Amino acid sequence: MIFLNSVISSSYLLDGLCFLLYCTMFFGYMRFIEWKSRGNPVYTVQGISSLARATWVKTVMEEGKDILAVQTLRNSTMAATFLASTAILLSVGVLTLSGQSDKLKITWQLLEYFGDRHEELMPAKLIILLVNLFAAFFFFASSIRLYGDVGYMINARYTGQDQSESRKVVEAEVVADQLNRAGDHYRMGMRGFYSMVPLVFWFFGPIFLLGASVLVVTILFHLDRTHAMEEDFYKET
């Protein structure tokens, strides 16, 4: 035990291992959810939302509910704008903390028992947190752009002679695909916020990073997973 503690304290092994497990858990979870959604769309809340958005687009375009479309897209755009602004403000806060790294080394690593005080890792932790926030910002900004494109596309009416049903279905599918892309980018931005929580706990020590990663992934699974009764209902409908 003494030998193991000396090995850990004399290197960055514990920090590197916990960060590797953090990346593996988050990226593995996202791949797992994506794989399950492709095989069974009603397995996750995201899959059900994609189906609902496609149905909503078809209904709006067929019945000409332009006001409803504008109001709904405006709400989605405002939410994405607020979160994008939040990501930028948090990034500015991280940049401010980078100039006070000496104080953070003393106040944030209070429990030395769970990991050695590697002061050289503090800038790297801040950079990783900053990259995570910028990624979330770009995803939210991309979703805003896509929501704006959908606003133009969903109100466009084909006025040519070819008014066949197949032409209308194709148009609805194109708009629904664009709207689902906006929803996916919004979801990835939220994933960036969720993955930020373990990174903040990393400042207290690598064990806190690992524990927070397990907790956040567990919570995300319960939030993303469709309940059995709801899954059976959507399968029947």
What are these regions (language model features)?
Residues D162, F221-F233:
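Juxtamembrane membrane-interface segments at transmembrane alpha-helix termini
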Residues R31, W35-N40, D149, M153, ...:
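Membrane-spanning helices that line or support transport/gating and their immediate boundary helices
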Residues A69-L95, G183-L210:
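Transmembrane alpha-helical segments and their cytosolic interface motifs
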Residues D15-Y43, T81-T96, L126-D149:
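Hydrophobic alpha-helical membrane-embedded segments
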Residues I2-S6, I88-G115, W202-L210, V216-F221:
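Juxtamembrane "helix exit" motif at the C-terminal ends of alpha-helical transmembrane segments
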Residues W56-I67, Y152-G183:
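Solvent-exposed, non-transmembrane helices and loops of integral membrane proteins
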Residues S9-L20, Y113-L129, P206-G211:
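Hydrophobic alpha-helical transmembrane segments
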Residues I33-L73:
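Membrane-interface amphipathic/juxtamembrane segments adjacent to transmembrane helices
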